[in-house]
Amino acid sequence: MVMTDPIADLLTRVRNANIARHEAVEIPASNIKKAIANIMLQEGYITDLEEYNDGAVPMLKITMKYGQNKERVITGLKRISKPGLRVYCRKDEVPKVLNGLGTAVISTSKGILPDKEARKLSIGGEVLCYIW
């Protein structure tokens, strides 16, 4: 079966693992999923990111991050720009998630960047998702 929205698949798998308080989640790898997972790692939403080859399909293993008493670090994940309705922003319209407490993931001409980096470089792009 062909996956129509791999970013939504990544977010859904991470959201479900987070709700069920799983230690880790495995997803089929792609360059865009790797870039989004790297941003999650840089921003402190996940503990570890590992890529391995499981036969014909390369996989990503994302180790989830929890607080002291298994409190969730990721409160929410939301897909913004969808295949049926793309959402773009100009350099002066880069969104802030929860007044800067969350992260917007933006696909720019310089690659996939968090909102803070896009603001610093003064570039806009396609708003892929929000993480908070």
Swiss-Prot record:
InterPro entries: Ribosomal_uS8 (IPR000630), Ribosomal_uS8_CS (IPR047863), Ribosomal_uS8_sf (IPR035987). GO terms for cellular component: ribonucleoprotein complex; ribosome. PROSITE patterns: RIBOSOMAL_S8. Disulfide bonds: none annotated. One of its GO terms (biological process) is translation. Keywords: Ribonucleoprotein, Ribosomal protein, RNA-binding, rRNA-binding. One of its GO terms (molecular function) is structural constituent of ribosome. It holds the Pfam family Ribosomal_S8. The keyword Ribonucleoprotein applies. Belongs to the universal ribosomal protein uS8 family. HAMAP family: Ribosomal_uS8_B (MF_01302_B). One of the primary rRNA binding proteins, it binds directly to 16S rRNA central domain where it helps coordinate assembly of the platform of the 30S subunit. PANTHER family: 40S RIBOSOMAL PROTEIN S15A. Part of the 30S ribosomal subunit. Contacts proteins S5 and S12. This is Small ribosomal subunit protein uS8. It comes from Clostridium tetani (strain Massachusetts / E88). The lineage of its organism: Bacteria, Bacillati, Bacillota, Clostridia, Eubacteriales.
